[in-house]
Amino acid sequence: MTNTRMLAAVAVASVLAAPAFAEDLTIVFKTTGGGGGGTVTHYFSSDKVRTGDADNETVMDYAAGKIVSIDHKKKEYSEITFAEMEAGLKAAAAKVDEASAQMQQQMATMPPAMREKMEQMMGGAASAVTVTKGGTRQVAGYTCQDYTLAMGQAMTMKMCATTALQYPMDYRKFQALAGSAAAMANNPMFKGMGKMVEEMKKIEGLTIADSTSMKMMGRSSESSREAVEIKKGPIPAAAFDVTALTPGYKKVPHPITKLK
């Protein structure tokens, strides 16, 4: 499983394990990673979400059923509906099925040790996922519980979650979309997704700090984020105004719509 697939799997699992809805939230994170440090702001309302930094942003409008991706550097943006997203995920799953079948045929002729290593790369590590509870600490004025999520030896994610905060949207309305992504768990390349979802249910509350360490194909990467400001209360509609966020920007096709 590639780094992107791993992170996507964690994202899906996070949505499926999301807490109940509450009032609007604005969270500012300090981040570190391969591209250097920075600041990312997340806006959560009952029907919209906006996340991103000075370079890239994403606006999700659950009421309208669409997602807008904004590239401030290129001055471009793209839109995709939930229906198109679901179709794209299904198309991606079909391609993964095809690639997996070909890989399985090739693996059948490999020595056992090499075959085992390939299976781990194709997602077997997800079935070895574990969540361990740690101590508590303070982040941005909130007490949070430390957890360590380990996916074999390929990825370790340390998270600190607080039960004092909740997402304002009701994710149960959008489980069909999450289900489309999770459906790829039926493919051998994503086996163990169910195990991941179950393990992540042990993480109680909203994550306000995390760090990720990944090792893949002889390479390693480190990234982290920690909330430095958390505000509760109504968010102005202007914060989600795509027109205002993309002045003079060019609209381009969303990459997922090209998956056929």
What is each stretch, according to the model?
Residues 1-8:
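Bacterial N-terminal signal peptides that target proteins for export
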Residues 8-17:
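Bacterial N-terminal signal peptides
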Residues 21-260:
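Extended soluble regions of mature proteins
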